[in-house]
Amino acid sequence: MTHITESEMKQKYLDLLSQKFDSAEKLATEIINLESILELPKGTEHFVSDLHGEYESFQHVLRNGSGNVRAKINDIFKDKLSQQEINDLAALVYYPEEKLKLVKNNFDSIGTLNIWYITTIQRLIDLITYCSSKYTRSKLRKALPEQYVYIIEELLYKSNEFHNKKPYYETLVNQIIELEQSDDLIIGLSYTVQRLVVDHLHVVGDIYDRGPKPDKIMDTLINYHSVDIQWGNHDVLWIGAYAGSKVCLANLLRICARYDNLDIIEDAYGINLRPLLTLAEKYYDAENPAFKPKKRPDKDVSLTKREESQITKIHQAIAMIQFKLEMPIIKRRPSFEMEERLVLEKIDYDNNEITIYNKTYPLKDTCFQTVNPNNPAELLAEEKEVMDKLLLSFQQSEKLRRHMSFLMRKGKLYLPYNGNLLIHGCIPVDENGEMESFEIEGERLSGRELLDVFEYHVRRAFDHKESTEDISTDLVWYLWTGKYSSLFGKRAMTTFERYFIEDKASHKEEKNPYYYLREDVDMIRKMLKDFGLNPDEGRIINGHTPVKEIDGEDPIKANGKMLVIDGGFSKAYQSTTGIAGYTLLYNSFGMQLVAHKEFNRKEKVLSMGADELSVKRVVDEELQRKKIRDTNIGKQLQDQIDILKILMHDRYLT
C-alpha cells in the first residue's frame, strides 16, 4: 500500500470537496448558511427512560412532547380560543386520525363541516408557523408531509400586503376541501407539529422488560426523525440473546413467562415456543405457585386454566435451564467473582435446603426434576436441543434482526451530549466514592475506561454471533447481572432466592453506593470530569431506578446536578412511585422536569381533551439563551465551516 502523508491526504480531501463546491459563490453560500444556523436557538431535547414495553403510554408522551404541544397551543391561542377549543385542538394534534372521525360525526351539514375544515387548517398553519420559528426553511420543509409541501409552504409564507393574492389563498384551501384532501392534510399538519416541538429524542434505557409491546416501541423509534439510545440492562439482555448468549436468552424467556408476555416472542417476533412447551409439559407441574404468571394490568381477559398451566410449566423449565447455563460461565470467568451464584451446587437435595452466603435456608416450591445432583450444570439432551433451536430462531427472526441492529446503531452505554452525561444505570463506585475497578482480560479498569471496554465487548459479541462462549458474549451477560456492571448496579441478583426461599431478607439486592452518593454535588462533579465534561455546567441524566415520589423522594438531586427520570412507565411500579414516570425537556431557555399521571386510555384524551400530564418543574433557566453554536451539532457545523474556509483560502482566495 502506498504511504500517503498527512499533507497529501489533506489535499486529496480538499480536491474531493472542491468537486461539490466548484465555485467561490457556492462555497461562500454554504459558509454563510452554516454560520447563520449557529446563531439559531438550540432545539428542544426530549428525554424519556424505562419504557418497559409500555407502548401506549410512550406513544402519548411522544405525541404530546411531554406537554410541549399544549404549551405551544396555549402560547398562541389562550386569548383567542375557549378551554374546550384548546383541548380539542390538542387532541387533534396528538391523535389526528381518531379525532377527525369523532369531529365529523358531530356535524349535520357539509357546509358547517367545511367551515370547520377552513378554521382548523388555518389554526394548524398558525401553530406550525410558531413552532418552526427557530428552524431554517430547509429544516421545516423536511418536517412537512411530502405530498403537500408546496401547498403548505404557500399557506405558511403567504404575503397579502396588497390584497392581490386573497382569492388565490381562498381557492387553495377551497380546492383542498373540494378534492377531499382536507383530512389527509390535517393529519399531515398534526404530525408536523409533533415533530417540530421536539428536535431530538433521548431514550435513556430499557425499551424492553415486562411490558407487552416493546416491538412497537422499536418500530416507532426506527421511524422517529432524530433519536439516540442509552442501553438499559433489559436492552442488553436482548442484544446478548441475539448475539448468541443462551443464558441471556433463557433470562428474557423467563421474564416473559413470569409476566405473561410470551406473545412478544411468538406473535411479535415469530419464534416457535412449541419445543420448549413440549419439554416443560414432560417434566413440570402446573400447580407450582411460585411460577404462576403475574396478572397483566393491560389485559381485560384472564388466562384460561390451560394457558396458565402451560405458562407455569414453561416458566419452571426455562428458569432451571437458566440456573444451569449460568454455572459454566461463573466457573470459566473467576474475575466475575460470582461463585456464590453457583446456586444449584449449594443445594442439599436430600434435605431440600440451600446454604448461601453462609446461611442455610429451607427451600419451597422446588422444581429440580431435571437437575443431576452430582453434576447440577448438566443440561438434559432435550434441554440442549431446545436452547439450540430457540437461539437459531432468535437469530433468524428478520424483525428481531432489524430491531437489534437499530439498538446497536443508535445505542451506547453512555452518551455525553450538549454538556450532559446520559447513562441508564450507574458508574460503579465504592463506599468512599472511588471508582470501582474490574478485571477484563488481565487489565483492571474503572470509570469511563471500564464502560468503554464493556461497550467494545457488546459490539464484538454482536459482530460474532457464531461465538457463544467467548469473553465478549459472557460480558454481555455480566452487564445484566454482575456486581461491577454499570447497568445492573447491585451486588447480586437474587432470582433463585425469590423463587425458592421464604425469608424475604434473602431477596434483598444491595445497591451500588453510587445510588446514595449521587446526592453529593462533589461526587457528580468528579464523575462529569472523568467523562470529559465541564463539572460547573454539566449534569448527569439517569434512569433505571424508580423515583418514589410517594415517599417524598426528589428526582432532582445534588443541587440539580443529577436528574433521575424513571418513575415508571411500567404499570407495576406505579403503586410504589405514586406517579407514571418523569420525562425531561431541555430547550434553549433551560430544563423542565415533567411528572406524569397514569395514562389510562387515549379515548379519554379524544373525548375530553384532558391530558394525563401533571406538573412541570423548572430545573434551571439559562442565564443566556443557548444557541446551536453551544451544542454537539454546533461543534460539528463549526468543524465543517473551518474546513470550508480552508478550501476557500486554498482554491479561491489569493
Curated annotation (Swiss-Prot):
SUPFAM superfamilies: Metallo-dependent phosphatases. It holds the Pfam family FBPase_2. It catalyses: beta-D-fructose 1,6-bisphosphate + H2O = beta-D-fructose 6-phosphate + phosphate. Pathway: Carbohydrate biosynthesis; gluconeogenesis. Its EC number is 3.1.3.11. Belongs to the FBPase class 3 family. Keywords: Carbohydrate metabolism, Hydrolase, Manganese. Its cofactor is Mn(2+). GO terms for molecular function: fructose 1,6-bisphosphate 1-phosphatase activity. One of its GO terms (biological process) is gluconeogenesis. This is Fructose-1,6-bisphosphatase class 3. It comes from Staphylococcus epidermidis (strain ATCC 35984 / DSM 28319 / BCRC 17069 / CCUG 31568 / BM 3577 / RP62A).
